[in-house]
């Protein structure tokens, strides 16, 4: 994988445990995160650490191979699916998507017990090597679309 790839999918949910909705394009802002997703809004007095979640298509495929399953990526409940680029395994890195969106990584997106409800063994399959993805906060607003370039800036 390289330092540049593409945005392969966008998903959001309007409430906890809500159904994931995939979209082709979306506005992502510092104030609200992914438009239409319940997790992105900044709460007064809080530092937003989990506005956006990203997962690599290659990591999802590896988890599916380990599990022997074929589950759609959005069942991971991540907002953005990237392909052809390795997401940073550290906090403070900047991911650029499209012309304007910038996301600062805030940590690993550890798989939760909800993954076991989707498929037995899924949590364990997502645990190694940051397969569950990364979390981030928006530092520069932007409208993004499936197919946009994804770059690691720092």
Locate predicted features.
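Metal-cofactor-dependent catalytic cores
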Residues: 1-154
């Amino acid at each position: 994988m390289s330092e540049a790839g593409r945005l392969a999918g966008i998903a959001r949910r309007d409430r906890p445990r809500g159904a994931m909705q995939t979209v082709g394009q979306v506005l992502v802002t510092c104030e609200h995160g992914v438009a239409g997703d319940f997790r992105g809004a900044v709460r007064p007095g809080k530092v937003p650490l989990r506005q956006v979640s990203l997962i690599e298509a290659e990591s999802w495929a590896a988890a599916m191979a380990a599990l022997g399953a074929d589950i759609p990526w959005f069942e991971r409940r991540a907002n953005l699916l990237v392909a052809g680029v390795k997401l940073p395994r550290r906090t403070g890195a900047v991911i650029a998507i499209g012309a304007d969106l910038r996301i600062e990584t805030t940590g690993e997106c550890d798989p939760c017990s909800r993954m076991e409800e989707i498929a037995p063994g899924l949590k364990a399959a997502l645990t190694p090597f940051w397969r569950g993805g990364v979390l981030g906060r928006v530092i520069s607003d932007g409208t993004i679309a499936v197919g946009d370039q994804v770059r690691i800036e720092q």
